[in-house]
Amino acid sequence: MHHLLEQSADMATALLAGEKLRELILPGSQDDKAGALAALLLQLKLELPFDRVVTIGTVLVPILLVTLVFTKNFAEEPIYCYTPHNFTRDQALYARGYCWTELRDALPGVDASLWPSLFEHKFLPYALLAFAAIMYVPALGWEFLASTRLTSELNFLLQEIDNCYHRAAEGRAPKIEKQIQSKGPGITEREKREIIENAEKEKSPEQNLFEKYLERRGRSNFLAKLYLARHVLILLLSVVPISYLCTYYATQKQNEFTCALGASPDGPVGSAGPTVRVSCKLPSVQLQRIIAGVDIVLLCFMNLIILVNLIHLFIFRKSNFIFDKLHKVGIKTRRQWRRSQFCDINILAMFCNENRDHIKSLNRLDFITNESDLMYDNVVRQLLAALAQSNHDTTPTVRDSGIQTVDPSINPAEPEGSAEPPVVKRPRKKMKWIPTSNPLPQPFKEQLAIMRVENSKTEKPKPVRRKTATDTLIAPLLDAGARAAHHYKGSGGDTGPSSAPPAASEKKHTRHFSLDVHPYILGSKKAKTEAVPPALPASRSQEGGFLSQTEECGLGLAAAPTKDAPLPEKEIPYPTESALPSGGPFHVCSPPTASAAASLSPSSLGKADPLTILSRNATHPLLHISTLYEAREEEEGGPCAPSDMGDLLSIPPPQQILIATFEEPRTVVSTVEF
């Protein structure tokens, strides 16, 4: 018993851990979305971080230093000349311009051709600009010569690395999984390793092609030559600025000199008098010396870094970054591919590592490499085989696995080595995802119950519009024809007391097809066939309860005028009020009980003359709409709610509700019998 409980707990833990690992390792549809987004936002980097640092140190920094010198010369005068006090303004400006052009120190007692020149101070900013342009030539040559080939190589490599991972995770893993399952639960670790090793020997054409490609790149050195030539050229070109700046820094220390302007203009004409000498000073010499020293140190440091990087790349480096992880997905990286370190594989490995953002399965490859000591050599296949062995599920996020529990009906004293293990497997339940816009869980709703409740709800009275003249003229004619046909059918057969329930049922089913104002309806659900409602009283029925002449007199209602009497065999064409609908439980002016009994006497139930039928039932007794009330259907035996409605909702009994009220006089028009 204890052994079974521990096994069940281990299985649950394995399923939970396998779910997390599967989400991490298996490629999914999110890879395609991430890859499409990365293709839009990222581009291939054709320059390594080390190369960018070298370009900044040899090109951008000297340009920045030159900018400082030009800014200082623009902000203040490049030369100061101390002219005598008797010089005018124009003479002082001329002396300053002449001395800035000559820049020769007029030493006394020395021939003029031997005077030292200070022209290097003026030329240094332009020399720094020229050196920066020269140092950019290697980077420009690499971009033009190697960018096209390097781009094609990287596109193929990055895509093929992802394909190798997907083929290993989705292609070969199911084969190993089936072979392990075919061995049964008694498979040993040695047999599992043999299955994995045999699967390693089977290679797809794509894997063979990729291995051949890596072998060819390991034997070629085109990119390696270009990369080496770039950095060697930087080393050679940096010798020129270093030599010039060292010479300038060592020799050009003087910032003050004497400028010879020539003979005095006040002297006699044609006589060689003493020359006028002016003391001058260059304020930017100290700044230029600092810039020269910084540039010398920077260039020397860049050269040292380049040398160290080249030695490490082509002599001492043993790792190839991403290529060292390919053996985990079935690609054998053979050491004999690289006859020497001076090959394209080293260069491509550095650029692949720089463009690792384009490798969608990089995180999974890193996981496999970091956890390889905890699992078998082929982590992807072994892990997927274990996951598939525990449960077959095509959905990567929702599992429908059954949970093994101990059967409560077994005897705990029974030994564990029985024929069948006392384990009951719960039925598997498929979890179905219901898409919804609301992130919160939706409560379960029963559609049948909802329909019943909605049908049993009482409707609110709707406002009735006032009828126009057209409705008043057309509605009675349409309704009169329908009522005459119904009455004719009812009076053609047996018109005994048993004909009252069919009339009530017919009224119930035709109540929704009225052309007039709809009555207030309790529910739209049809009554069951076994529950037949009792018939309405004859005094309340709209099918047969028409007011006769005697009843009208008994109620005190005004009869039709005498001038309408001489209209034999003719209907009233246009009544003053519209007819009531042919269906609906309305309260009409109820006559006394005696008149109702008289109307149901055998003498009155005989077959009437067709002319009398047409003259009596041509139009409905016209009542004003203010007399419409809802009938008490439960008391009168009319249609009621089904019997199972009380289980869902308790509905209060209907009340007499006034639909609409108008202050117009009530008029009742009836036919005249002849």
Swiss-Prot record:
Expressed in the eye, thyroid, prostate, kidney and liver. Abundantly expressed in the CNS, including hippocampus, olfactory bulb, cortex, cerebellum. Not detected in the white matter. It is found in: Cell membrane; Golgi apparatus membrane; Endoplasmic reticulum membrane. Glycans are attached at N86. Residues 11-53, 147-230, 317-674 are cytoplasmic. The modification Phosphoserine is found at S590, S601. Keywords: Cell membrane, Endoplasmic reticulum, Glycoprotein, Golgi apparatus, Ion channel, Ion transport, Membrane, Phosphoprotein, Transmembrane, Transmembrane helix, Transport. S-palmitoylated in neural stem and progenitor cells. The chain crosses the membrane at residues 54-74, 126-146, 231-251, 296-316. Residues 75-125, 252-295 are extracellular. Residues 394-408 have a biased composition (Polar residues). The keyword Transmembrane applies. It comes from the Eukaryota. Pfam families: Innexin. It is a multi-pass membrane protein. One of its GO terms (cellular component) is endoplasmic reticulum membrane. Residues 394-426, 485-510 are annotated as: Disordered. InterPro entries: Innexin (IPR000990), Pannexin (IPR039099). PROSITE patterns: PANNEXIN. Belongs to the pannexin family. Forms PANX1/PANX2-heteromeric intercellular channels on coexpression in paired Xenopus oocytes. Does not form homomeric channels. PANTHER family: PANNEXIN, PANNEXIN-2. Structural component of the gap junctions and the hemichannels. This is Pannexin-2. The gene is Panx2.
